[in-house]
């Protein structure tokens, strides 16, 4: 097997794009051997069935008389020897049956080959998509943050499948090559000189479409880049549909979308026209040269009627074959930018991969999370998100981090979860630096509840159980009860089996947040971070969430960190941290800070 693998690597060295699939293990030795075997069998049955027509035509021409007036062809001698070996007589009936069997076997092998190539193509497309998805999710936050939504969706969905299409195009091209070799072999045995003329003509036709292959490559690069910007546009507009409707901007947005659609239409038409040139040029040229070759062979090489018939049959088959060959070369060129895009994502994300298991396990209890003289600046930003911030978050208490938008609140919690690393200073769990602990052990002790709830198109039970797949139904129900979510869940038609629509659109914002809170409680994390989680909920839901947090803090020794700029959200807080423009303004107990001259006091007065 190792020798076979080395041979495959050597052969694929001439096809760097194809070698990529093998190098990254999207394509195995068995896949290649299976595909090649099926295509080889298709070719063998095709060639032999065509060659069988020669002795059959010779028999028909002589009206079944085996004592031909003209010396039999080479093919007659081959088939006569073969039939005699099995004790069969070479006649019209046996040859006709042989042709029927060979055609059936050829079609059977072709069917198996098509199914195999399509299966392989979709499997590789799936594996490419999953490798990209895994790589992006496992990369550091800086890499993920720079990956736009449109590029993410386009890479996972469109580009992965398009890249896999190159694999099928290469396989089809290889099959065509085998078919051409088979046809020309039959022709060479029948009439060597005439066959050389046909081969030369075929080579010239293949070279003539080279410029269209380059055009297809350039157009495909434009399509890849355009799809990303188009997907970004659509995703951005869909996320902000409320703002569009309220501002009565529907017509303007539709007009803008039409400009994108028009550009995509123009690119698609250009690709279609470029591909259509194969039909416009290759087929007529091939027909003219085929007729010329046929004329030369009949006049100058004195071929028999049976040999002329086989030449006509092969030349007629070569016309669509040569056209298909040109199409597949264009397809490879069209898929190449997608393959490069996908492989670059896989390589780049791998180079930015977080190592989750390096370091000690954070298992000990600690009195506080200490932020010491931390400074952080986002890449490509001129401003410091945090500047020399020193503060402390006591464990088993409720801490609120407040401040204006852009004050650094979310950046601070990202530092606690080790999603980012400070440029200066350090984060400590107790007296030990976060750098000593593995990222996995730190994040296992943290649950994050965002302003936009992550709700799946699944049942209530499955949505809550997501963080702990092994959790029992009773544990899920207890978590929902703690999150004050059990009342509304029991009022749903199917209770815990009720299917929540994508993003939870069939329940209210407050109910979605309580589902998220139940999920956080089920995870049994020590630290729960709520990033403006009550910002878009009604007063009643906010009060329910506040009660749930009070309950979980009191009875379960949880550290609650609340990011907010709404004063109602931070009732019954034990500790308060105030940020402004990336700097620490104050920290301490709320009842003490409300007398200081700071942003918190001004907000309370308002």
Question: Where do the protein language model's features map onto the residues?
Answer:
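Membrane-integrated ABC transporters
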Residues: 1-51, 60-99, 105, 112-117, ...
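Juxtamembrane loop-to-helix connectors within ABC transporter transmembrane domains
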Residues: 25, 117, 137-183, 239, ...
């Amino acid at each position: 097997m190792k020798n076979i693998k080395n041979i495959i690597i050597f052969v694929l060295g001439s096809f760097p794009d194809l070698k990529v699939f093998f190098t990254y293990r999207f394509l195995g030795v068995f896949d290649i051997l299976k595909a090649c075997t099926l295509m080889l069998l298709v070719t063998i049955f095709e060639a032999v069935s065509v060659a069988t027509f020669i002795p059959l035509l010779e028999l028909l021409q002589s009206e079944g008389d085996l004592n031909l007036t003209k010396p039999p062809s080479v093919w007659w001698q081959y088939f006569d020897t073969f039939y005699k070996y099995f004790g069969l007589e070479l006649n019209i009936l046996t040859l006709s049956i042989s042709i029927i069997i060979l055609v059936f076997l050829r079609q059977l092998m072709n069917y198996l080959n098509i199914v195999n190539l399509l299966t392989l193509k979709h499997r590789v497309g799936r594996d490419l998509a999953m490798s990209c998805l895994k790589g992006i999710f496992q990369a550091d936050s800086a890499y993920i943050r720079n990956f736009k939504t449109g590029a993410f969706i386009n890479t996972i969905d469109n580009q992965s499948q398009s890249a896999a299409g190159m694999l099928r195009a290469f396989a089809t091209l290889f099959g065509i090559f085998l078919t051409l070799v088979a046809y020309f072999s039959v022709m060479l045995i029948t009439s060597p000189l005439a066959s050389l003329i046909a081969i030369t003509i075929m080579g010239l036709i293949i070279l003539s479409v080279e410029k269209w292959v380059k055009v297809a490559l350039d157009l495909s690069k434009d399509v890849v880049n355009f799809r990303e910007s188009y997907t970004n546009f659509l995703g951005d507009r869909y996320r902000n549909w409320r703002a569009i409707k309220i501002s009565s901007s529907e017509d303007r947005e539709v007009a803008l979308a039409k400009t994108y659609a028009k550009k995509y239409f123009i690119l698609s038409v250009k690709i279609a026209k470029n591909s259509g040139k194969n039909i416009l040029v290759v087929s007529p040229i091939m027909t003219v040269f085929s007729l010329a070759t046929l004329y030369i062979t009949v006049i100058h090489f004195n071929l028999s009627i049976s040999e002329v018939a086989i030449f006509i049959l092969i030349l007629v088959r070569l016309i669509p074959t040569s056209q298909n060959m040109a199409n597949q070369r264009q397809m490879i060129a069209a898929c190449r930018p997608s393959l490069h895009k996908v492989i670059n994502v896989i390589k780049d994300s791998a180079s930015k991969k977080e190592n989750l298991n390096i370091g000690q396990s954070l298992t000990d209890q600690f009195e506080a999370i200490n932020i010491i003289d931390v400074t952080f600046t986002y890449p490509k930003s001129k401003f410091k998100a945090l500047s020399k911030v020193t503060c402390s978050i006591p464990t088993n208490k409720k801490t609120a981090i407040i401040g204006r938008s852009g004050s650094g609140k979310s950046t601070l919690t990202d530092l606690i979860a080790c999603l980012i690393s400070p440029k200066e200073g350090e984060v400590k769990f107790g007296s030990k630096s976060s750098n000593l602990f593995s990222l996995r052990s730190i994040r296992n002790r943290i649950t994050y509840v965002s302003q936009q709830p992550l709700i799946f198109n699944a049942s209530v039970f499955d949505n809550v159980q997501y963080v702990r797949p092994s959790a029992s139904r009773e544990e899920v129900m207890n978590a929902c009860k703690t999150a004050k979510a059990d009342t509304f869940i029991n009022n749903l038609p199917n209770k815990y089996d009720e299917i929540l629509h994508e993003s939870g659109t069939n329940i209210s914002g407050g109910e979605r947040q309580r589902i998220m809170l139940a999920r956080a409680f089920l995870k049994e994390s020590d630290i729960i971070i709520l990033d403006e989680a009550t910002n878009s909920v009604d007063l009643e839901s906010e009060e329910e969430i506040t009660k749930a947090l009070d309950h979980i803090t009191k009875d379960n020794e949880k550290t609650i960190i609340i990011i907010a700029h709404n004063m109602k959200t931070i009732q019954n807080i034990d500790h308060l941290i105030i940020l402004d423009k990336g700097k620490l303004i104050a920290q301490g107990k709320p009842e003490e800070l409300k007398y200081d001259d700071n942003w918190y006091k001004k907000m309370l007065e308002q």
